[in-house]
Design a protein with these regions (language model features):
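Short capping segments at the starts of secondary-structure elements
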Residues: 33-43
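Acidic, low-complexity/disordered tracts enriched in E/D and polar residues
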Residues: 1-35
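Local cysteine-cluster metal-coordination motifs and their immediate loop/turn environment
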Residues: 109-119, 368-371, 405-422, 474-486
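Radical SAM/AdoMet-radical enzyme domain recognition
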Residues: 136, 140-156, 165-290
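C-terminal accessory region of radical SAM enzymes
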Residues: 306-340, 370-417
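Iron-sulfur (Fe-S) cluster-binding segments and ferredoxin-like electron-carrier domains
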Residues: 117-131, 373-379, 414-451
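Short Fe-S-cluster ligation motifs
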Residues: 140-158, 396, 434-478
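Conserved alpha-helical substructure of the radical SAM core
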Residues: 58-204, 209
Length: 486
């Protein structure tokens, strides 16, 4: 499968199954397109000779050489490569039940009242509650017991607002550290917070114990304060920004992300990203499209898509400009490592929700991920009895890119792994469906990310200043020398 497109002055050809990315001239671009349409090299060459007959810089010999190059790349498996991965997908139901990550809902309550919140202002359409230390401790024991030989274990403190249960977070990390050596585990904690509860103690603790922190900010003050308000309806921007700045400064080079949501009301979301970068000093950025009912005022529309596509292109080109100036920023969805993975297992199966990754409620119930919490049809079990709804777990095991018929002809499927099961469920009623609007956005982001990779390879100045990413994928391994354990 081939995907071709033109962006920012580059002719880009992606060979889907080999993962090869080619930047080519006009002749090669047209030649590959004709072959992909089923023409023989001879017939394609004849068409190109007619098309380029008026150009002195394109001779019949040049066209012949071009087809020789195409044949050479094809023989090397870098063009028109066959799909060698389908067979991997059919064995997924028989894979192990190893769990590698938990999302701990330490608080089903929140000190903000964001109107677009999928979690119903932190209560997940149920009762408010805080996780006890005993429940959290059992969740960590459950993770260790079901992690097999995997060493690296991921735990995200989530809510609601997890800092409303900060004491339990501290106790749980202390407990995890106390059992790491005995079980040969390495816990990596993430704190996701709206910032209201950040104190100097929280900053010191996060910077000591958290592998990553995710800080919720939608960008410009007027954008952020449209939705991210407290229970009295007051905006949160002025209270959280200084705290975020202090935390990030204290983290030094440790991981963090500013995580925003854009809606129909701010499809010019690059202004929010640039505000966070230029005015506030944040360099690690993420901005997610809202997922809302179609009749919601903030829901994105089909009419918004051209504007969003323009925004993604604007962002990619501006990031290249910043790189050349030696002041790069990171955008989460443009992180792409073409050399080091993730492995094909991860590229087929995605996030592992419901199998390798689960969410734990304050009462110890297990769900496939945070977006399923509160739906009784998607309760997997609990941290004491384990996964008791094995049929549901098996259904999620089969939730991969090859299980989605709509993904069959999509060039981006080995980059999205079939997309989000929760979004598919909400859009189609089936976790094996596809959220088509999200697919369109994802494909555009991938085109921009690939274009940036091409630009960095072709421009030494960009390459010198580019932010380097190497995948730390542990999708099927134990973190030791690339050992694979499915």
């Amino acid at each position: 499968m081939i995907h071709q497109y033109k962006l920012s002055g580059y002719n880009i050809v992606l060979d889907v199954y080999s993962g090869s990315v080619h930047a080519v001239d006009d002749v090669a671009y047209d030649a590959i397109a004709l072959i992909d349409q089923g023409l023989s090299c001879q017939d394609a060459a004849a068409q190109l000779e007619k098309k380029y007959a008026g150009r002195a810089d394109v001779t019949p010999a040049d066209i012949s050489d071009c087809f020789d190059d195409i044949e050479e790349l094809t023989a090397a498996g870098q063009l028109f490569a066959p799909d060698a991965y389908a067979d991997h997908a059919f064995d997924f139901k028989n894979r192990s039940n190893v769990v590698k990550a938990l999302c701990l809902h330490v608080a089903h309550t929140c000190n903000l009242n964001c109107s677009y919140c999928f979690a119903a202002q932190g209560k997940f359409h149920g009762e408010a509650g805080l996780m006890s230390f005993e429940t959290g401790k059992r969740a960590l024991d459950f993770l260790v017991e079901h992690s097999g030989t995997r060493r690296n274990l991921e735990v995200d403190f989530f809510g609601g607002e997890p800092l409303m249960n900060f004491e339990v977070c501290k106790q749980l990390v202390a407990y995890a550290r106390s059992i790491e050596k005995e079980h040969n585990k390495n816990f990596r904690f993430t704190m996701t917070t709206n910032g209201i509860g950040i104190t100097d103690e929280v900053i010191d603790w996060c910077n000591k114990e958290c592998h990553n922190v995710v800080l919720s900010l939608d960008g410009r003050k007027e954008v952020n304060d449209r939705f991210r308000v407290d229970l009295a309806g007051n905006g949160s921007y002025d209270r959280i920004v200084p705290k975020f700045q202090k935390l990030v400064k204290a983290r030094g080079g440790q991981g963090y992300y500013m995580r925003g949501t854009f809606t129909h009301h701010n499809v010019d979301f690059t202004k929010d990203l640039f505000h966070m970068a230029d005015d506030l000093g944040f360099t690690e950025l993420s901005m997610e499209p809202v997922v809302a009912p179609p009749d919601s005022p903030e829901a994105l529309t089909e009419e918004d898509l051209p504007k969003l596509f323009d925004q993604y292109e604007l962002l990619a080109n501006d990031m290249l400009r910043r790189q050349k100036a030696g002041k790069p920023i990171t955008f989460y969805h443009y992180i792409l490592d073409l050399k080091h993975g993730p492995c094909i297992y991860k590229r087929i199966s995605g996030c592992g929700s419901g199998t390798e990754y689960m969410a734990v409620t304050p009462w110890g119930d297990l769900y496939p991920c945070h977006q399923f919490v509160g739906d009784p049809n998607y309760k997997l079990g609990n941290v004491w009895d384990g996964v008791t709804n094995t049929a549901l777990r098996d259904e999620f095991k089969l939730c991969n890119v090859y299980a989605r018929p709509d993904c069959k002809d999509c060039w981006a499927r080995l980059y999205c792994a079939g997309g989000c099961a929760a979004n598919a469920l909400h859009a189609t009623g089936d976790i094996h469906g596809t959220y088509e609007y999200g697919c369109k956005v994802f494909r555009k982001r991938m085109e921009c990310a690939l274009m940036m990779q091409v630009a960095q390879r072709l421009d030494p100045e960009l390459a010198k200043n580019a932010v380097k990413f190497e995948s730390d994928c542990d999708g099927c391994g134990d973190g030791n020398d690339g050992a694979c354990e499915k």
